Curated annotation (Swiss-Prot):
The chain crosses the membrane at residues 17-37, 53-73, 107-127, 128-148, 181-201, 231-251, 257-277, 306-326. This is Galactose/methyl galactoside import permease protein MglC. The lineage of its organism: Bacteria, Pseudomonadati, Pseudomonadota, Gammaproteobacteria, Pasteurellales. Pfam families: BPD_transp_2 (PF02653). The complex is composed of one ATP-binding protein (MglA), two transmembrane proteins (MglC) and a solute-binding protein (MglB). It comes from Haemophilus influenzae (strain ATCC 51907 / DSM 11121 / KW20 / Rd). It is a multi-pass membrane protein. The keyword Cell membrane applies. Keywords: Cell inner membrane, Cell membrane, Membrane, Sugar transport, Transmembrane, Transmembrane helix, Transport.
Length: 336
């Protein structure tokens, strides 16, 4: 084999190493239990992927700008708890706010998304105008949000918030059945969210600005892009995606606590990187994000399905994250 062919083979391995590793893991799962490959599991994987996809779409926009958001999971938890207290059934004897009537679902969506937008606004302002690095800024808001959420959670009883209205349960847990396959409503919401993000990234000036900022902030500024304003906007949009995802997650699970959303941001970031969204900025596709989320969910679901110890699952997921980021760094180093 010539040196050129060896280099090509090495480049191919480097570009696709993470997929080879994940395929090996999937092969091990199937070998351990061939019943993993069935329509019921496929339906469950799609449903579990859906909320994670909505969250990952928010995170992906930030990664494209060379940013990140460690507060994403805590924002999901805050939205879940707030929406849960607003959407309990009127017949629920443990209803948090018994004096309130049944609040329409669209009103709750608007309320939690507004809260998410405000949190995103704070993150964006701190990062864009105070020049605090995204890692530090969002780590701070992560802690603050968890504190506020825990105070609120304790104030409304400090126990899992459940007993949702029938309308909300149907909204979050409903599905269309086709034979033994169930297409959940949540999957449809995620598909709509993905379509909206695709349009935003590919068909709007704002999307082009976001990619320009990620590719080279200084060049974007020279070309007339208001970098600070666009950064604030992308963090606000991300906050709204987290909020909607948190509301859906509460409904999907059937309850909410202040710890819901823990580590969701790491899963989202890892899924984005596996799907080709670069930490170096300026690179990413919606299809890639979808692929990354589904791959990660298949691995999570599969490891649980074959009974792998949850602690080993943390070790495996952490290793995948390190490998994905390392490969991304190697790709970027070569381009530099």
């Amino acid at each position: 084999m010539s040196a050129l062919e060896k280099n090509k083979s090495f480049d191919l391995l480097k570009q696709n190493a993470i997929y080879f590793v994940l395929l090996i893991l999937l092969g091990i799962i199937i070998a351990q239990d061939p019943t993993f490959l069935n329509l019921v599991n496929f339906s469950n994987i799609l449903t579990q992927s859906s909320v994670r996809l909505i969250i990952a779409l928010g995170v992906a926009g930030l990664l494209i700008t060379q940013g990140t958001d460690l507060s994403a999971g805590r924002q999901v938890g805050l939205a879940a708890v707030i929406s849960a207290t607003m959407l309990q059934s009127m017949e629920n004897i443990n209803r948090v706010f018994p004096e309130m009537g049944q609040i329409p679902i669209p009103v709750v969506i608007l309320a939690v998304c507004a809260i998410g937008a405000v949190i995103g606004l704070v993150n964006g302002l701190v990062i864009a105008y105070l020049n605090v690095t995204p890692f530090i800024a969002t780590m701070g808001t992560m802690i603050i949000i968890y504190g506020f959420n825990s105070l609120y959670y304790d104030a409304v009883g400090g126990s899992p918030i459940a007993g949702f209205s029938e309308n909300f349960s149907t909204f979050a847990q409903g599905f269309f059945r086709v034979g033994s396959f169930k297409l959940s409503y949540i999957t449809i919401y995620a598909a709509i969210a993905a379509l909206l993000v695709w349009i935003m990234w590919n068909k709007t000036r704002f999307g082009k600005n976001v990619f320009a900022i990620g590719g080279n902030p200084e060049a974007a500024k020279v070309s007339g892009v208001n970098v600070a304003r666009n950064l604030v906007a992308i963090y606000m949009i991300a906050g709204m995606f987290y909020a909607f995802g948190g509301m859906l997650e509460a409904g999907r699970i059937g309850s909410a606590t202040n710890n819901l959303g823990f580590m969701y941001e790491l899963d989202a970031i890892a899924a984005c990187v596996v799907g080709g969204v670069s930490f170096a900025g300026g690179v990413g596709t919606v299809i890639g994000v979808i692929t990354g989320v589904i791959i990660f969910t298949v691995i999570n679901y599969g490891l649980t399905y074959i009974g792998v110890n949850p602690y080993w699952q943390y070790i495996i997921k952490g290793s995948i994250i390190i490998l994905a980021v390392a490969i991304d760094s190697l790709k970027y180093a070569k381009k530099k």
